[in-house]
Amino acid sequence: MNNIDNLIENLNKEQKEAVISTEGPNLIVAGAGSGKTRVLTTRLIHIINQKKAWANQILCVTFTNKAAKEMQNRVMQYIKGSANSVPWLGTFHAISVKFLRRHAEALHYKSNFTILDTDDQKKLIRNIVKGEDL
């Protein structure tokens, strides 16, 4: 039994089905601590192992930095040395920024652009209003 088989063996029935069904997308909806990240990472490793896709053809997105880091650590542990590329793993925001930076020139932006959060936006507006005596 290889490493991926061990990973799959430790899943429950529904989780195994989600991992092994490699045709088309899966939507995993479950509560906190139920194993969503484990299912996603195991499925990703299984897809690469079964040669259904190259690692860099896979996009795996999550909401939290914690889950993204966990996914990256788990996947890289199993694919290092066996894959020539790395999957796109991360939060919606991180992947979007990576994509925008890669294609910034097509949008007539520099790739070192800054994204302002709400607080920074408010500060910028205040500074402009103050500087323009509005």
Where does each model-flagged region fall?
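P-loop NTPase Walker
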Residues: 1-110, 115
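Conserved ATP-dependent motor core of P-loop NTPases, especially the RecA-like helicase ATPase domain
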Residues: 92, 110-134
